Amino acid sequence: MKIKTLEIKNWRSIKELKVMTQDLMIIIGQNNHGKSNLLSAILFFFGEIKHQDLDFFQGAEELFVDIEFSELDDQDKKTFEKYVTQQETIKVRKVAYLGGSFEYKGWIQTCLEDYLKEENAGNYTSRETASSLPFYQYLPPAGRLSKQQIIEAQQKYIQSNIRNLTFSYELEETNFMGLKSVAKGIFGEVYFLPAIKNAADDFASKDTSVFGKLLGEVVETMSQHNEDWQGTKQQLANLFSKFSKYINGVENTERPKQLSDLENELSKELLSWNAYFDIELNIPDIDSVLKSNASVWSNDGTRTDIARKGHGLQRAVTIALIQLIAKRQLQSNQDSETTNRKVSKSRYFIFEEPELYLHPQAQRSLFDSFVELSTSGNQVILCTHSSNLISIDKYKSIYIIKKENEQYGSKVTQCEEDLFDGNQKNEWNLSYWINPDRGELFFAEKVILVEGQTDKVILPALADKLGVFKHSYTVIDCGSKQNIPLYIKLMNKFKIPYVSVYDKDHQENKSEQAIGAADSATKAILDEINNELGLSVELVNDIEQELGYDCGKSGKPFQALKYIKSSEFHISESFAEKIRVIYK
């Protein structure tokens, strides 16, 4: 199963927040705006971290995290049967209280028919009463009826007639699944890679480490299928059976004399206490022995443990471990059958700034790995400061978190619907190759949308010359005038301030038809602009005319840059004012 919706209230900088999730979630935003708080709320729900009094939003005495799960497999439906809705989802809330306590509660789709309400089950334990009710066929044919049998019959009847019944959706008053505490991992495995972590911890042989989990799977497989391994375990069992004082209730005459002598000597010393000693040697768990004595070495020309390698390699190896576990689990899920297990097979991978210590090319490769991981039945959630871990064509996976003020707390902006269709989608995807670093726009204070490379080079250079350049502004080459509206759509959806810079394209040598096409392209830009977020600046008729220089057809950006750096260049006051407006 996977997270479908996430609702948070009163957690750290988050007063109230609800987001629709994706298989891949990329959380971005400025420092101290709530990215890590969003991740930590998810970790709190899964039991990976404990809440503290400082985690409560501004004086709140209660906080909660609600998660709705979808894509339940047959085993999940069986495990969480009580909570499965008509839409085959379940919703669970983890509540924490100031002072330390917490509890899980499930949302229950309650049938409005009184005879199907769980709280009324005790009224129907009389067989005479129960026999008149529609769910009677699901009860045992004879014997006394218990309240639990009535509840189970109610649930079976509801499942069989779910489309013909009316429901309300309410938070249960009792604990989730009737348990005072929910076992860690009941909703699936969580793998969390924080921003700062000692890679040696992941390669420790303990069961909770990433490597320990992977090694545990290998040892379990060997234990079940390797004949030599099974033979060794049997030999150990035979050996240790000789140390037992009794075998099947009969005294063991082959027991080593040294053990019996030690028992007798100890008993003799405590004769006045009427105390007698038995020494029992238990068979060691060879699986645990092997795991606890494992060590991992890395050889990149020099054989050392992983802690003595560079941070980049340490980070890469940890991520590789996680990816390997995901691949093995995918194969395991395909081969397994429904069982009576009480935990979900789901896996959630949570990364905090995974780009740390990795060069740009490695970051881009890592992002491809995350995409592959998210399309293999897993859910991947990460927060990042790197544009290399963002793909603009996956705009539905992008979550921009902002904290406008302390009173309202952190809020998320996301896009749930398709922005483009048909040719627009193709043009949007093609424009990636024109501007592969366009993911940077999501981190910008303001985005400057331009038609081509010459504009992208010249506008910042002129802004620098005029003393108005700002590093927090990003210039995006849209590839053509016709593509600018596509970017404006995206800016509007994510509420990113922007300015659209386009050519009027009314040159004297142009035909009426060409001018008409240019005007249509201009209108498409102006129609798309949201005046609360963006504005437009028109160049007459293009940047070359504004500069008063013909750059030629070859190497236009470089030729134009040489010109504005030369002593003969003087910018017109009208063009200078446009530059100031763009960088305002």
Residue ranges and their predicted role:
Residues 185-187, 195-351, 510-511:
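Extended helical coiled-coil dimerization/tether regions that scaffold
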Residues 60-65, 87-92, 186-190, 346, ...:
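Short glycine-/polar-rich loops that comprise or flank the Walker A/P-loop
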Residues 37, 74-237, 514-533, 554:
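Glycine-rich phosphate-binding loops of NTPases
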Residues 39-89:
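Conserved P-loop NTP-binding catalytic core
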Residues 1-47, 258-261, 289-292, 296-437:
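Switch/communication elements of ASCE P-loop NTPase nucleotide-binding domains
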Residues 19, 56-61, 83-87, 183-186, ...:
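Conserved catalytic network of the ASCE P-loop NTPase/AAA+ motor domain
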